[in-house]
Structures are given as structure tokens and as C-alpha cells.
């Protein structure tokens, strides 16, 4: 019909009838929330698969990550023992208040949908407030992302993961002080101290990922993902860390679950058409474009870029043609 999959309709109706239904449906079940500008759906799919090796899981695997979609997922998974939920950045504070999550996964923050969310420091402050409001919550945070590091910097229970930060244009200053951020190959720090005199610097990670495998506090394991791209290796590292540290999932089972994901709501899927193999990639902001273009197979016969904004195509086509 062209009207979408309808994943939020039930939640919209239920939320209108009972404004407190999210908390009621949550029922105190152990929950993990996954948030960030890019990688939410992929990380949630990997994490849900890992937690599912030990528990029954309810999740919004269609990417419906606002209130209505979350409520729909909770209604569909009423018999599940655990909740693994992708949550829009601006919805995290009240979703956390409703579900009191056991774990919060913080991926990255960059410019996205400025007409809706405004400047990203607003999101950083909102997420930081959610962390402060739930001091017992385990936070799995990307220490390579300056903004997410600020969100989790004062958390009492935090695991730092070196998941990478491909796009740096939105984190040239400290979100708390405005001080310039200096970067080296494997470190960053703000030249201006925090209000209490502490240095704001990249924390030392206990989890990480490189081209060969995933690094844990006790071991290094191979990591052979079906999904392309450096960013997805970082997503996998955070998903695996959350499953192991947050829910006691066996490390090897968590890795296998992440490796088994080859399609996320159509993203990264491969289509065979008229004798050709077509790989679909999605990008919706500058950071996503940078990552998607890095995944392009330079030996491919062709590259097609499609946009849902008609005003973009005429302006962009000559530049793309010139770059061929």
C-alpha cells in the first residue's frame, strides 16, 4: 500500500488508551536499551541474537524505535523473559524511566535530522541525564566517541569499548566546556578541564576490536562478520560486551550470534537480479555516508545512489559523474 509495515499502529493505539502502558508491559523484566545516531538496528539485532542463546527475548527488530514501536514490541513479546530494545536518542530518558533498564549501550552521536532533534549537544545532555537518573545501570560506552564518552563519564558502572569513530566533524570540542579536543592515533583529550578540575580524556577501554578479532578483558577471539564495514565491527564489539557483561552470555556464543547476522531490516542485503548481484547499503547522515562509501566494492561494475529527496539529485549528479 506504500504506507509502511504498520509496526507502530498497535503501540500508537495502546499508548493513547493507557499512557503508562510501557511500564506495565515491561513488568520489571531485565532490559537493555541500545541508542546512538548510527548502528542502532544492527547492534540491537546482534545483541538480541546473543541474549537469545540464553533467554527468551522481546525486541523491536523492525527498527521502530520510538514509543509506539517499543510498546508494540513489548505487546508482541509478553512471554519473553528479557527485553532488547533499540531506542531513539531523544526517547531514551523516558523509556529508561519506564523500564528501568539493566544495561544501556551508547554507540555514537553525530548530526542527524537537525529539524527534529536540533543540535547534538542537546542529545548529549539528555542522555547524560538518563545515566545520572539510573546509577545502578550498566553502561556500555564507545570511548572513541567524544560525545558518548561525556554521556557516560560519571557513570558508576561503565564498561568502555574501543568501537571506533569514523566521523569526527561533530566532536571537535568538549560538549561540557567547549574546550578544543586534541586527537592522536589512539587517544584524545580536551585542553580545558571540567568544572570540577578533572581532565576530560579518552578512557582506557577493556573491550575493543581490530581487523583480526575482538579484544575482551581476558582474551582475544577471531571475529568474522557477515556484514561489511569497520563500523559494524565496532557495533559487534559493543553488542558482545553487553551480552557477556550484562547478561552472562557465553563469549563464544555471543560472537557466533553476531557473526550470523547478514541482513538488518533490508540493510546490507544482497539481491540477485537479471544475472547481477546487488548489495544494498543505507546512509542517512554524513557519518553514515562516509561509512557506506567505505564499503563500496571498487571492482563492482557500477554504483547507483538513490535518494528520497528530489532536490538532491540534480545538484549531485554532475559531481558524481565527474568523480567516476
Question: What role is predicted for each listed range?
Answer:
Residues 1-160, 167, 173:
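Phosphate-binding loop of NTP-binding sites
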Residues 157-287:
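Adenine nucleotide phosphate-binding catalytic loops in nucleotide-utilizing enzymes
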Residues 8, 29, 42, 65, ...:
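Conserved active-site and cofactor/substrate-binding residues in soluble primary-metabolism enzymes
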Residues 264, 282-324:
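Active-site beta-alpha connecting loops in nucleotide-dependent enzymes
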